[in-house]
């Protein structure tokens, strides 16, 4: 079965990132979650690190925008199927 890579570019997403990570952790298919934080100055990184057991790779460094962050995530992906899920998004159950 092919695996899914979920890439989350985020900057100052502390308000919603926890809900996103919770929803992804409940997926019933094989996946890897890669989060690319663009150097947030709120609590985003602190929240992400609480969930590190559900996240394959955390990248935290300045970037030059969302597309730079997305490309960084793609380079770290090991799968054929890639989806992007922004910090304010989440998956519904079922």
Protein language model annotation of sequence segments:
Residues 2-5, 32:
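Cell-envelope/extracellular polymer assembly enzymes that use nucleotide-activated donors
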Residues 8-19, 39:
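Active-site beta-to-alpha loop of glycosyltransferases that engages the nucleotide-sugar donor
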Residues 15-18, 42-50:
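Acidic helix N-cap motif at the loop->helix transition within catalytic regions
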Residues 22-31:
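Short, acidic, metal-binding catalytic loop of nucleotide-sugar glycosyltransferases
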Residues 30-39, 59-62:
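Short beta-strand/loop segment that forms part of the nucleotide-sugar
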Residues 37-46, 86:
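A conserved acidic beta->alpha catalytic loop
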Residues 60-77:
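Glycine-rich, basic loop-to-helix element that forms the pyrophosphate-binding segment
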Residues 82:
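Short aromatic/hydrophobic "clamp" motif used to bind/position activated sugar donors
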């Amino acid at each position: 079965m092919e695996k899914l890579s979920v890439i989350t570019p985020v900057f100052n997403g502390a308000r919603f990132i926890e809900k996103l990570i919770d929803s992804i952790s409940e997926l019933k298919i094989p996946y890897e979650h890669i989060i690319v934080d663009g150097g947030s100055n709120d609590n985003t990184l602190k929240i992400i690190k609480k969930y590190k057991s559900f996240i394959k790779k955390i990248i935290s460094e300045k970037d030059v925008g969302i597309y730079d962050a997305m490309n960084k995530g793609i380079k770290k992906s090991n799968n054929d199927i890639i989806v992007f899920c922004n910090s304010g998004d989440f998956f519904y159950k079922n």
